[in-house]
């Protein structure tokens, strides 16, 4: 028996700005089509809901808390959700169907790491070797 491995969960980050040349009507049609597409993906078990993000936020670091994010950033993060796929490539193919991509938005997709952070394991936030 050759059973397919269980799907992996990926985080999707929606970034960017709408094309300046697109009309509000075109953008609204893309948004409406997105919600139809998204609900179909959720119903089919390929996505899990996330959320749009509000405009205001804060940056928190050891230096303290400052206002942000800033709208002049090159690629504003507008929201997030989750994709269930068997590979990063499959996740990207699913996301390529997002109707909003035609109007300037970009989706970043990253596999979620189920392991607890470890300073000795090589990960996205591991310090460079000394």
Role assignments for model-derived ranges:
Residues 1-130:
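Conserved, structured core segments of small domains
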């Amino acid at each position: 028996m050759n059973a397919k491995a269980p799907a992996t969960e990926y985080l999707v980050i929606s970034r960017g700005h709408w094309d300046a040349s697109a009309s509000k009507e075109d953008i609204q049609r893309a948004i409406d089509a997105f919600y139809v597409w998204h609900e179909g993906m959720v119903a089919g078990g390929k996505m899990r809901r996330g959320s749009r993000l509000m405009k205001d936020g804060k940056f928190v670091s050891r230096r303290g808390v400052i206002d942000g994010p800033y709208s002049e950033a090159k690629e504003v993060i507008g929201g997030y959700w989750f994709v269930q796929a068997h590979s990063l490539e499959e996740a990207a193919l699913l996301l390529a169907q997002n109707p909003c991509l035609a109007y300037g938005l970009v989706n970043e997709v990253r596999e979620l790491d189920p392991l607890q952070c470890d300073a000795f394991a090589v990960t996205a936030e591991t310090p460079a070797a000394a």
